[in-house]
Amino acid sequence: MLRSSRGAAALVGARAAPAILWALGLAGCAGQQSALAPAGEGAERLASLFWIMSAGAVVIWVLVIGAAVYASRLRPGPHGERIGRAVLWGGTAFSTTVLSALLVYGLVLMPDLRAAGDGLKIAVSGEQWWWRVRYLPSGDGVPIESANEVRLPLGQRVELELTSPDVIHSFWIPPLGGKVDMIPGRVTRLVLEPTRTGRFRGACAEFCGTSHALMAFSVVVLEEAAFEDWLADEAAASIAPDSPAEARGQELFLQVGCGACHTVRGTAADGTIGPDLTHVASRATLGAGTLPNTSDALVRWIADTEAIKPDVRMPSFGALPEEHIQAIAAYLEGLE
């Protein structure tokens, strides 16, 4: 009796194992970067495609396993051979029909996912290992440049123009849309249409060098009015220092050469190699998602950049006196 109970338990466990593994796999898909919690029109279509294809795969798997078990129990003979052939051809026809239907369904979705946007255009350049973001004007205006964060208005189809000046990167924001490669010398496009507000995490999904794993970005979806207010603020020049510490930090920022690589609009800093820092204090992270944007993190980043993000182009400034680093950090904290 005990042996029989153990056998039954083992059989139940073996049958339940795939379901348990499936549930654990889905549990790992939660969070800011989940494709199964869509917050955009394109992501919702992709999630529907995933679930429908998963259901089709389960149906085919059950049919094939069931047919194999049934065929293995047939007794040899003319009758068994006829049934075996029927099972073989029936299973093949059913699987082909289901797979063809899934293919057609996927192809029908593609034109809508790639349709052009009808409003705002944003140019995003993936660079080792950060993101240059430029909001393109509708007329002859000047692009508004930012870095490592993309802000979108709720409910609008926004077209992203994606490229890279160095190696292949891949722009991937699972809650809002699919993955699109960024190829040097080419411009690829991705259209996003957010359906709810919030902050969502994205990442480079193509290995691009030493600090590939430290190349994240955020997409912040705002109500339309809030987005327009933010865009107007982002277009403005930097805020003048309002304390002696910040004024000293601005002086040192220019003196030690930070302005050769970074732009701070409204000052003599006009470098284009690194991120635009005009409103760096309004961003949530430093170093493309590597550190939170706090006072201590700013000091660490300035003093020992290369240890935090290997092979990054920005040199470490640890040789500067501690008070100088603190002053530069205070200045950057004021650039909201």
Locate each region found by the language model:
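N-terminal secretory/membrane targeting signals
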Residues: M1-G31
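Alpha-helical transmembrane spans of integral membrane proteins, capturing the lipid-embedded, hydrophobic core
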Residues: I20, L24, V58, V62, ...
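Non-transmembrane, membrane-proximal soluble domains of secreted or membrane proteins
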Residues: A30-L49, R73-T272, G287-P310, S316-A330
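Alpha-helical transmembrane segments
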Residues: W61-R75
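Short, solvent-exposed mixed-charge patches
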Residues: L335-E336
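Membrane-entry segments of alpha-helical transmembrane domains in multi-pass membrane proteins
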Residues: G42-V62
